[in-house]
Amino acid sequence: MKLVTVIIKPFKLEDVREALSSIGIQGLTVTEVKGFGRQKGHAELYRGAEYSVNFLPKVKIDVAIADDQLDEVIDIVSKAAYTGKIGDGKIFVAELQRVIRIRTGEADEAAL
């Protein structure tokens, strides 16, 4: 099993959610986060003064999947989140040792 973590621009959340749903992904966790990468941040003008905004708003999506879904998930998320502009985001993949559905006690892939 894998844990796929995706950091994207907030306005792409619904596109990514719909794309994941279209391939049968039924559950995900979404968190509003702030961060920066190569994009660094940007300057904003407020009441005539320029301010530096170092952390940009992003959305983090966590989804637990079976190993055989990994390539399809990466492909569909990459396409759905793409704008071609700096700051499109990142996809991180980690091994999942165990998953337990608390209500039923189901474990591992049965709990996904």
From Swiss-Prot:
Q: Which of the residues bear the PTM O-UMP-tyrosine?
A: Y51
Q: What is its main location?
A: cytoplasm
Matching SMART domains: P-II
Q: How is its activity regulated?
A: Formation of the GlnK-AmtB complex is influenced by intracellular pools of the effector molecules ATP, ADP, Mg(2+) and 2-oxoglutarate. The rapid drop in the 2-oxoglutarate pool upon ammonium influx and a simultaneous, but transient, change in the ATP/ADP ratio promotes AmtB-GlnK complex formation. ADP orients the surface of GlnK for AmtB blockade. The GlnK-AmtB interaction is also controlled by the level of intracellular glutamine and the uridylylation status of GlnK.
- Return the InterPro entries for the record: N-reg_PII, N-reg_PII-like_a/b, N-reg_PII/ATP_PRibTrfase_C, N-reg_PII_CS, N-reg_PII_urydylation_site
Q: Which UniProt keywords apply?
A: ATP-binding, Cell inner membrane, Cell membrane, Cytoplasm, Membrane, Nucleotide-binding, Phosphoprotein
Q: Name the family.
A: Belongs to the P(II) protein family.
What is the role of this chain? Involved in the regulation of nitrogen metabolism. Regulates the activity of its targets by protein-protein interaction in response to the nitrogen status of the cell. Involved in the regulation of the ammonium transporter AmtB so as to optimize ammonium uptake under all growth conditions. In nitrogen-limited conditions, GlnK does not interact with AmtB, which remains active and imports ammonium. When extracellular ammonium increases, GlnK associates tightly with AmtB in the inner membrane, thereby inhibiting the transporter activity.
UniProt protein name: Nitrogen regulatory protein GlnK
Q: What is this organism's lineage?
A: Bacteria, Pseudomonadati, Pseudomonadota, Gammaproteobacteria, Enterobacterales
